[in-house]
């Protein structure tokens, strides 16, 4: 198991490479990363104001001209009006190309701060300090940034890799159990597409898997980050292989849009994973036991595995706008077996109806 007292590092082998550091008490690493930056802007959510101010004050004590920029919570922050506000503040405080941003918050904060870094002066450095499980295992790793529009989720964005990701496990201690469970959906995804040991660890003790200061969750984080880092290192710009990280996300993004982004991302991904497994099963690509295993594991973590039985027509409309769609043809990442991701292109409408019926039962 991962020792929470001794930070571990997972390298993301892009150009240039960067570390994902997992542990506790990571302030020294932040100091080192920002040592040569004259000016720094810390983008954070309202609930983290006190801690963000402590970071700002600490950096100021080191001679850094540090500023805070507060952004709205969750998906409300991933809006063009928020970006306009951020750009205005970055200009006012004088962030230059040799300066840096710090994202401090959950996955949505990482997405919007990363997009700000990608677009300001055509790209400035950023360090991600995720404070949620979802941020640690997914949003902060891989360089995807973006905001939402009326057309859909994350359709406006850029690839912009960080200087580093600092995943301080101590920040998870104050999170509600539902928030940790939400992040576990992405961990489970990593298990099904690449690392079945993740699934074994969760099945052995689901509740221990949700304990941020126990021995299981840090190991799950390390393994999930390793899966994503490996995929991103091989396919940074999502030309083909990286698409497997979207397992469960085609339906998930449609659900989020239908729910006006009021559902937790992990809850939507959980439903999306079950749907993708059912779709593979009814298509004859996945065995019954592995499909059922999705349902069992996600349920054991308190995550939803069903959705509104009457919602399919609207969800299909939204899925047609998914970024994986080509020439109007739906594409799904599915499994051909445990840790054997594949694609299902242009499935027969009857398959979609049958798979969704299993989901909404």
UniProtKB/Swiss-Prot annotation:
Main location, first listed in the record: cytoplasm
User: Please, which domain of life does this record's source organism belong to?
Assistant: Bacteria
Q: Which GO terms describe its cellular component?
A: cytoplasm
Q: List ligand-binding residues for NAD(+).
A: 73-78, 107-111, 131-132, 144, 153, 171-174
List the catalytic activities from the record.
Answer: 7-phospho-2-dehydro-3-deoxy-D-arabino-heptonate = 3-dehydroquinate + phosphate
Pathway given in the UniProt record:
Metabolic intermediate biosynthesis; chorismate biosynthesis; chorismate from D-erythrose 4-phosphate and phosphoenolpyruvate: step 2/7
Which InterPro entries does the UniProt entry name for this protein? Dehydroquinate_synthase (IPR050071), DHQ_synth_AroB (IPR016037), DHQ_synth_fam (IPR030963), DHQS/DOIS_N (IPR030960), DHQS_C (IPR056179)
For molecular function, the Gene Ontology terms on record are:
3-dehydroquinate synthase activity; metal ion binding; nucleotide binding
Coiled coil regions, renumbered to chain: none
Q: Which UniProt keywords apply?
A: Amino-acid biosynthesis, Aromatic amino acid biosynthesis, Cobalt, Cytoplasm, Lyase, Metal-binding, NAD, Nucleotide-binding, Zinc
- GO biological process: what's one of them? aromatic amino acid family biosynthetic process
Q: How is the cofactor bound?
A: Binds 1 divalent metal cation per subunit. Can use either Co(2+) or Zn(2+).
Do you know which Pfam families this protein is assigned to?
Answer: DHQ_synthase (PF01761), DHQS_C (PF24621)
Q: What class of enzyme is it?
A: lyase
Query: Recorded E.C. number(s)?
Result: 4.2.3.4
Residues passing through the membrane, by range:
none
Name the CDD domains on file: DHQS (cd08195)
- Cofactor(s) the protein requires to work: NAD(+); Co(2+); Zn(2+)
Annotated compartments: Cytoplasm
Residues noted as binding Zn(2+) in the record, renumbered to the chain: 186, 249, 265
Q: What is this protein's function per UniProt? A: Catalyzes the conversion of 3-deoxy-D-arabino-heptulosonate 7-phosphate (DAHP) to dehydroquinate (DHQ).
Q: Which family does it belong to?
A: Belongs to the sugar phosphate cyclases superfamily. Dehydroquinate synthase family.
- Descriptive protein name: 3-dehydroquinate synthase
Which species expresses this protein natively? Mycobacterium leprae (strain TN)
